[in-house]
Design a protein with these regions (language model features):
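Bacterial N-terminal signal peptides
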Residues: 2-13
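Sec/Tat signal peptide C-region and signal peptidase I cleavage site
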Residues: 16-19
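Active-site-adjacent structural segments surrounding the nucleophilic cysteine of cysteine proteases
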Residues: 21-191
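Short linear interaction motifs
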Residues: 139-152, 226-229, 236-246, 335-339
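Extracellular structured ligand-interaction cores
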Residues: 156-162, 240-242, 253-256, 268-270, ...
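Conserved active-site-adjacent core of cysteine acyl-enzyme catalytic domains
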Residues: 167-253, 263-266, 276-278
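Active-site signature of cysteine proteases
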Residues: 249-320
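Extracellular glycoprotein-like low-complexity segments
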Residues: 324-588
Length: 588
């Protein structure tokens, strides 16, 4: 966390070279860019001199990249609060005052937009690719793409290290144009104002680890440290940085930018790296070719606890090809052949991380066969506040339950569950997970279920992107008693949704149905609907439009129907019931 040290920043000695004077050390080199936003003394005060932790030995391979001026001018961030704390210290993209920070009155980074999603996933994220704006590259997104963007943003709460490492290298290599990253010139990044172009590119490249099917498995499996050094010795003299370097261990993973190799003698080598937690500083990964081992120590920031990755503690090290990161990735939500389900979760408060267990079950409640899914950990080390949750890839055609068991929780614990698949996705938001509880969320092609061992208030969303129209149905039982099972059954061909539960007393529900097409969007909601025991809600939206509400009833056990009113979601209604209505991609 930067906040703890922000008020101690003072003007002290400058540690970057004067304008026009080249510096051949491994931290900085070339001409400094003009237009400094941050006084260079800030970096000296926070991160120490450029020689702290620097590589040692004789340079035997050098790409020419330097953390200054080719790295980003502010450190890695995770949550919106982290980003605002960076803005307080570094003034980027706009200065945040302490009063604004304390009052939560600051601008958070925008989620991935249509242009960024198209660059990563292709035009299938657009509802109608023919409607792409030729000037801006934007389009109306399918609902699944909006939910995917939200998932990537949620997954990055542990940090954007992979995106920062890849973007800095790709910019230096000329693989990304400067205006796509917001830099002042080709490869010159030190004066980057860190506006929306930088945020969009960093975030979408961070998301590549969720989307490229072989990226995380290869990074986690690792490779021989000795062979890795030989690869860098062979490729870096070409004047580009072809790889992101990843380390992975029990504490999680990290991604950094390798740009030079130094020979320390006696079989020891230092790999000079730009670690995006330490702007403008050269750090070293040490490799012992005698034992084919490595060692690297880093931290979220200089004031936080450090993490060590090494062969001794069974960590792995790998190179990820920048070309693979920049390539168009398979789209897990675009309309087309079922590629399986990408299951993702919001990050956990670090204080709770050891108390939360995630399992997959069959619809009958038995453990799901392990050959039907694979689990991977994103390349994010835990921060002082957040720890990333795993990613789970489930084979096509598999219906399953997600079980989340909580032990003794030390902090407030909301949870989001994303189940993303081609054309149809599901989402669960639980504002508060209770200690010593278990929740179960069922994911199927046309049904969703929920149950908890403690009282709760789940919000369940199902999405479907058709050829011309996208639909979004939501159910929110308020004050759901423990052990009560909730069902949300969606007959998409008949355009009907049934909301039911096993409750033995009256429950109160919010239900919402949204239709989106190129001509516009219409959303209808019924709020605080009382539903007696054994009754259900039936919504028929087959004839609904922007001006015609869906038909809706509370259907009693004896099949008696009581009509219920659904009202159009308007700006004024959103203002009045902001905490109870869904945006298109969910309530987050």
């Amino acid at each position: 966390m930067i906040m703890a040290i922000s008020l101690s920043v003072v003007l002290v000695g400058i540690a970057v070279p004067a304008s026009g004077s080249p510096d051949t050390n491994l931290a900085s080199g070339g001409k400094p860019p003009g237009g400094w936003i941050v006084d260079p003394s800030v970096y000296q005060s926070i991160f120490g001199g450029v020689g702290v932790g620097a590589p040692q030995g004789t340079v035997v391979a050098d790409s020419g990249f330097r953390p200054y001026p080719h790295g980003f001018p502010m450190p890695n961030w995770g949550t919106n609060l982290d980003f605002a704390q960076n803005a307080l210290v570094y003034g980027m993209p706009t200065r945040v005052t302490l009063e604004q920070l304390d009052g939560d009155k600051y601008q958070s980074p925008a989620p991935l937009n249509a242009l960024s999603l198209r660059r990563s996933l292709g035009n299938g994220v657009c509802r109608d690719p023919r409607s792409i704006d030729p000037k801006t590259g934007k389009c109306d997104l399918i609902l699944g793409a909006e939910l995917l963007a939200q998932m990537i943003e949620t997954g990055a709460q542990g940090g954007h290290c992979f995106g920062l490492a890849a973007a800095a290298a790709a910019l230096y290599n000329g693989q990304l144009p400067a205006n796509q990253v917001g830099a002042s010139g080709l490869g010159i990044n030190a004066a980057n104002p860190m506006g929306d172009p930088a945020i969009q590119t960093i975030t979408r490249l961070f998301g590549a680890q969720f989307l490229a099917p072989d990226l995380l498995p290869a990074a986690v499996a690792g490779q021989s440290p000795t062979e890795l050094v030989e690869t860098l010795k062979r490729t870096l003299p070409g004047g580009t940085v072809p790889f992101v370097l990843t380390v992975f261990g029990e504490s999680g993973g990290h991604a950094i930018t390798p740009y030079a190799v130094l020979d320390r003698g006696n079989g020891l080598y230092d790999i000079a790296v730009y670690d995006n937690n330490f702007p403008f500083r050269a750090l070293a990964v040490t490799v012992d070719t005698n034992t084919d081992s490595f060692l690297y120590t880093s931290a979220v920031n200089p004031n936080s606890a450090s993490y060590t990755w090494s062969t001794a503690n069974k960590s792995t090290i790998a190179l990820v090809d920048i070309d693979d990161v920049l390539a168009q990735q398979p789209c897990p939500v675009c309309r087309g052949k079922d590629q399986g389900t990408l299951l993702a979760f919001s990050s956990f408060p670090s204080a709770n991380a050891e108390e939360i267990t995630i399992v997959l079950l069959t619809p009958e409640g038995q453990p799901l066969a392990s050959d039907l899914y694979r689990t991977l950990q994103p390349l994010n080390p835990p921060t002082e506040s957040q720890q990333s949750a795993p990613l789970i890839f489930v084979d096509p055609g598999v219906d399953f339950l997600v079980g989340v068991a909580a032990g003794k929780l030390a902090a407030s614990q909301p949870i989001e569950v994303y189940a993303l698949s081609n054309g149809a996705s599901s989402y669960l938001l639980l504002d508060e997970v209770t200690s010593d509880s278990t929740i179960v969320f069922g994911v199927g092609e046309d049904a969703a279920t929920f149950q908890s061992t403690k009282a709760s208030s789940p919000r369940i969303q199902q999405l479907y992107d058709g050829r011309t129209t996208s639909y979004d149905v939501n159910g929110h039982p308020l004050l759901l008693p423990k052990e009560v099972k909730v069902n949300q059954d969606w007959d998409r061909s008949a355009k009907k949704v049934r909301y039911s539960s096993s409750a033995k007393r009256t429950l109160t529900w919010n239900v919402q149905v949204t239709g989106v097409r190129d001509s516009g969007e219409a959303s209808w909601v019924a709020l605080r609907v009382p539903v007696p025991a054994a009754a259900e809600i039936l919504v028929d939206y087959s004839r609904a439009s922007a001006t015609t509400a869906p038909l809706a009833w509370v259907v009693a056990k004896d099949k008696t129907r009581t009509p219920m009113r659904m009202q159009r979601v308007t700006d004024s209604l959103v203002d009045q019931y902001r905490d109870q209505l869904y945006a298109v991609q969910g309530p987050s």
